[in-house]
Amino acid sequence: MRVTDFSFELPESLIAHYPMPERSSCRLLLLDGPTGALTHGTFTDLLDKLNPGDLLVFNNTRVIPARLFGRKASGGKIEVLVERMLDDKRILAHIRASKAPKPGAELLLGDDESINATMTARHGALFEVEFNDERSVLDILNSIGHMPLPPYIDRPDEDADRELYQTVYSEKPGAVAAPTAGLHFDEPLLEKLRAKGVEMAFVTLHVGAGTFQPVRVDTIEDHIMHSEYAEVPQDVVDAVLAAKARGNRVIAVGTTSVRSLESAAQAAKNDLIEPFFDDTQIFIYPGFQYKVVDALVTNFHLPESTLIMLVSAFAGYQHTMNAYKAAVEEKYRFFSYGDAMFITYNPQAINERVGE
């Protein structure tokens, strides 16, 4: 399969730079996986699409202010993007500089360069940085960090992004990108879903900066997926198995929830799904056998991204590309701050041949 099979034309004007004033007021494109039928609606229509007893699985990661500016003590300007927090003092990060710092280099971080840190080691493209400060990494990031808006949101981060670029149920700090499908859920909608009898469970996947890395190979089977830490606790496993047992659906909110659940299913030894606390490099593209997820809430993804490949594996390649074509024609808003889709699983997707 070629990466170019997942390309589509997207006018610049359809990339959303700000979210809707009200989280749940965005548009919703419904894609029926088995037939490919499309229905246009608004996000709150989700309420009518879910049945009592269906299980919504959310990702409760919280975005950290992961972008830092500063300079090397020796002079040159640097930009640091945290990939993950290693412990209370150390981070693993991407560093952009005219000349990469060497191990032992002193860094002066923050807009006022008040935070002292040392680059201690290099691991491939990533740098290990230790803060020389009594405060924890999280406290330092909260005081001097900028929200890591995706590269296609072409504006500086604003104070408002600290809340707008978080889900209302975010709980565990560690992501450098929001699980954006969840941005559309506000408290009134969650309350109505609960009142209807829709069940809810929470996994954690700390989204890494790798989520924005372009696929740099021609053939997708050659792509090496970035690694992210995921947690699928016992209560989620129990909720999934119970939903399946009573004939209800498991609905993943976002591709990160999909990847968490399907990673836990892949690693399971005895049951359909078992608890999972580990790094995952799961790469889902057409031909993948889904085991857990029956329906998916997701935003519109970048052309040639691993995420549009994941959706194609779920709904079927042709159905997915047709839906994206319709979304462009109907001027849906794309990417992190954009509109959403609700997609049901297409069991025939696995048999589809792409690009032949």
Swiss-Prot record:
Pathway linked to the protein: tRNA modification; tRNA-queuosine biosynthesis
What InterPro entries would the database entry show? Answer: QueA, QueA_dom1, QueA_dom2, QueA_sf
Any GO MF annotation of the entry: S-adenosylmethionine:tRNA ribosyltransferase-isomerase activity
Alphabetically, which GO biological process terms does the record hold? queuosine biosynthetic process; tRNA wobble guanine modification
What main location does UniProt list? cytoplasm
Q: Where in the cell is it found?
A: Cytoplasm
Give the E.C. number(s): 2.4.99.17
> Domain of life of the organism in this record?
Bacteria
Functionally, this protein is described as follows: Transfers and isomerizes the ribose moiety from AdoMet to the 7-aminomethyl group of 7-deazaguanine (preQ1-tRNA) to give epoxyqueuosine (oQ-tRNA).
Q: Of which family is this protein a member? A: Belongs to the QueA family.
The record describes its quaternary structure and partners as: Monomer.
- Name this polypeptide is given: S-adenosylmethionine:tRNA ribosyltransferase-isomerase
Q: Which organism is it from?
A: Escherichia coli (strain ATCC 8739 / DSM 1576 / NBRC 3972 / NCIMB 8545 / WDCM 00012 / Crooks)
